[in-house]
């Protein structure tokens, strides 16, 4: 049933109908559309459009429809209705007859869909926040179990300074905490109701929109009807949140793909999140992580696409805005799936401590310690930096780590170097000295774990 047929003398071309209809994707808003309709029926009682008995009949029928939708949402797709609003209204009329035709009084699909989408976004943000915190918790637990797993830290994908696997985990906890904060911030701006703004100029009925907003669980009602029906900032914000969050997950995946490789060998992934090759029997491929990394691109694309869709639209509503849903649904579904999968990857990961330790001892990751040692002996840092660079060249020539160079060889580069240099060059000393807040010392890592556990109520 079309909601707009009276103006037209010809039926829509079937090809246009297929092009125009949105039920195939906006059916996901069915529950929100029904909930919004119940609230609207209550508002219509306050302005005398519906009697209390009529409202009761409508609410009962809508609640029955809500249970039917929850039991089998796929039934909606069997309809040829234009959109979810048409489908709900048609089903309501089937249940209560002519009374169902009174429900849309004073309401437009413009404020209706804006409300539906905001309600859906609020619910989805809460799901994302839960999944985000679950992954943070998994990272904290993995960190706690691997505080003594020393490994090389990297810059430019070259070994730089020793860190611990726990410190690496906590780096991603920080990223995810920022993602959590962004979602919570987005939720604040989502929490205003556009219902009652009509097509663009507001409703002609003296409905208390603040009361209506409260019935729907919003903090308040929007302030301008033109903006309310054309606002899709919340879609852009959520897509931006998702794009940033997926960048973090993609980096997480890339790190672990490298750590899991034969070239690094720092971790082994569980069989539960890997697959094999149809040709090469020995292969164990990190498919879960590669898919997380790969799916990042589709989320970035959804954000870019929506920004391009909105950038040239005049006020107020335009049909272009129908394009807001498919990209949003897919992007947030993808982000949610990837958060869950990242937690599953951590659930079975094994850290290979001996291999991590060996790698941390290679690559002259303690060179900065020698420079700091020279500074403590009164050598200016820039000069110390140069001295250590020369010492590294000599160590490479001899095929030895810095700590294996004889004292006489080290003193060729600076006479201030003494026997006390060797304890300074140990991996444990490298870690212990990074004791400022946020550093990799065991004490700081333990404190960071405790802080994260307190924040996450673990």
Curated annotation (Swiss-Prot):
EC numbers for this chain: 4.3.2.1
Signal peptide: none
Compartment(s) where it occurs, according to its Swiss-Prot or TrEMBL record: Cytoplasm
Highest taxon above the source species: Bacteria
One GO process term, biological-process aspect: arginine biosynthetic process via ornithine
Gene3D superfamilies per record: Fumarase/aspartase (C-terminal domain), Fumarase/aspartase (Central domain), Fumarase/aspartase (N-terminal domain)
Primary location: cytoplasm
Cross-referenced Pfam families: ASL_C2 (PF14698), Lyase_1 (PF00206)
Any single GO CC term annotated in Swiss-Prot or TrEMBL for this entry: cytosol
Assigned keywords, A-Z: Amino-acid biosynthesis, Arginine biosynthesis, Cytoplasm, Lyase
Keyword check for Cell cycle: no
Catalyzed reactions: 2-(N(omega)-L-arginino)succinate = fumarate + L-arginine
Example of a GO MF term: argininosuccinate lyase activity
Protein's pathway: Amino-acid biosynthesis; L-arginine biosynthesis; L-arginine from L-ornithine and carbamoyl phosphate: step 3/3
Top-level class of the enzyme under EC nomenclature: lyase
Similarity comment: family membership: Belongs to the lyase 1 family. Argininosuccinate lyase subfamily.
Name recorded for this polypeptide: Argininosuccinate lyase
Encoding gene, per UniProt annotation: argH
């Amino acid at each position: 049933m079309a909601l707009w047929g009276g103006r037209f003398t010809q039926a829509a071309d079937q090809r246009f109908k297929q092009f125009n209809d949105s039920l195939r994707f906006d059916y996901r808003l069915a529950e929100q559309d029904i909930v919004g309709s119940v609230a609207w029926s209550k508002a219509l009682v306050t302005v005398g459009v519906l009697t209390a008995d009529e409202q009761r009949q409508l609410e009962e029928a809508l609640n029955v429809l809500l249970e039917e939708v929850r039991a089998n949402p796929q039934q909606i797709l069997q309809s040829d209705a234009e959109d979810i609003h048409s489908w709900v209204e048609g089903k309501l009329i089937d249940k209560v007859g002519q009374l169902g035709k009174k429900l849309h009084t004073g309401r437009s699909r413009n404020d209706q869909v804006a409300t539906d989408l905001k309600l859906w976004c609020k619910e989805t943000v809460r799901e994302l926040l839960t999944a985000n915190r679950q992954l943070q918790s998994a990272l904290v637990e993995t960190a706690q179990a691997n505080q003594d797993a020393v490994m090389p830290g990297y810059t430019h994908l070259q070994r730089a300074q020793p860190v611990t696997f726990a410190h690496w985990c906590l780096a991603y906890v920080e990223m995810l905490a920022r993602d959590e904060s962004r979602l919570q911030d987005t939720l604040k701006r989502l929490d205003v109701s556009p219902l009652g703004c009509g097509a663009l100029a507001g409703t002609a009925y003296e409905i208390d929109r603040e009361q209506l907003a409260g019935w729907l669980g919003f903090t308040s009602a929007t302030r301008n009807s033109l903006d309310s029906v054309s606002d899709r900032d919340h879609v852009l914000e959520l897509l931006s949140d998702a794009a940033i969050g997926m960048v973090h997950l993609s980096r997480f995946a890339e790190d672990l793909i490298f750590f899991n490789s034969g070239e690094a060998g720092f971790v082994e992934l569980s069989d539960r999140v890997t697959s094999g090759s149809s040709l090469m029997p020995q292969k164990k491929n990190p498919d879960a992580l590669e898919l997380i990394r790969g799916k990042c691109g589709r989320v970035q694309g959804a954000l870019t696409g929506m920004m391009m869709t909105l950038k040239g639209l005049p006020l107020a509503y335009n049909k272009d805005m129908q394009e807001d849903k498919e990209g949003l649904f897919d992007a947030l579904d993808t982000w949610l799936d990837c958060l869950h999968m990242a937690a599953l990857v951590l659930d079975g990961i094994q850290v290979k401590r001996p291999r991590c330790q060996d790698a941390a001892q290679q690559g002259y990751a303690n060179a900065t310690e020698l420079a700091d040692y020279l500074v403590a002996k009164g050598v200016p840092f820039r000069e110390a930096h140069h001295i250590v660079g020369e010492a590294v060249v000599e160590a490479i020539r001899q095929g030895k780590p810095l700590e294996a160079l004889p004292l006489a060889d080290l003193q060729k580069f600076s006479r201030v170097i003494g026997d006390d240099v060797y304890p300074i060059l140990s991996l444990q000393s490298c870690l212990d000295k990074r004791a400022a807040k946020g550093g990799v010392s065991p004490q700081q890592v333990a404190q960071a774990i405790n802080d994260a556990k307190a924040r996450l109520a673990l």
